[in-house]
Amino acid sequence: MITIVLLILAYLLGSIPSGLWIGQVFFQINLREHGSGNTGTTNTFRILGKKAGMATFVIDFFKGTLATLLPIMFHLQGVSPLIFGLLAVIGHTFPIFAGFKGGKAVATSAGVVFGFAPVFCLYLAVVFFGTLYLGSMISLSSVTASIAAVIGVLLFPLFGFILNNYDPLFIAIILALASLIIIRHKDNIARIKNKTENLVPWGLNLTHQDPKK
């Protein structure tokens, strides 16, 4: 019984639409009607500012971490923490508290990885922010980090680097999360190809995007 309750709790944690609620409560703004219409971290930064964007990121990240740690906190045996984390990501993407229309799963997925394999998460953070500096695009950084996660989970155990052993479930979860993130960024990928993707106000913009075109 406790297993079922905690699995439901993991989904409900993921379903907390932090950006949407922050916009409605503190700014009287519905993020779905502004910018990209997304309720995640990036659109929150653009529409509501740095403080709201950072708060959204922190909540979205750590709800993934907390969900992943639920079975450890309650000394639950028999179900991998990754399953709880996956349910949080599903909740974030399809939140019951926001009409099943959620974010792109980047921050919450990162939180899940942090809760299960923090050093591997650090590797992905380096990839993410390195790509962000070079390309000035959150979307490109998210997709690149997703691809790097797949490469890392498949290759690192061969060399005993960061990941010492192959974990079939971790591989499957990484493949699922990476696929979800890339699919959720399909419109961004199209804009990157057309060189019209939105930029952050720093970095090198090596692909010469011009969102005003």
From Swiss-Prot:
Organism this protein belongs to: Streptococcus pneumoniae (strain Taiwan19F-14)
* GO MF annotation list: acyl-phosphate glycerol-3-phosphate acyltransferase activity
TM segment ranges? 2-22, 54-74, 80-100, 110-130, 143-163, 165-185
Entry EC no(s): 2.3.1.275
Q: Which controlled-vocabulary keywords does the entry list?
A: Cell membrane, Lipid biosynthesis, Lipid metabolism, Membrane, Phospholipid biosynthesis, Phospholipid metabolism, Transferase, Transmembrane, Transmembrane helix
Catalyzed reaction equations: an acyl phosphate + sn-glycerol 3-phosphate = a 1-acyl-sn-glycero-3-phosphate + phosphate
Q: Return the InterPro entries for the record.
A: G3P_acylTferase_PlsY (IPR003811)
A GO BP term here is: phospholipid biosynthetic process
Supply the gene name: plsY
Q: How does it assemble?
A: Probably interacts with PlsX.
Q: What is this protein called?
A: Glycerol-3-phosphate acyltransferase
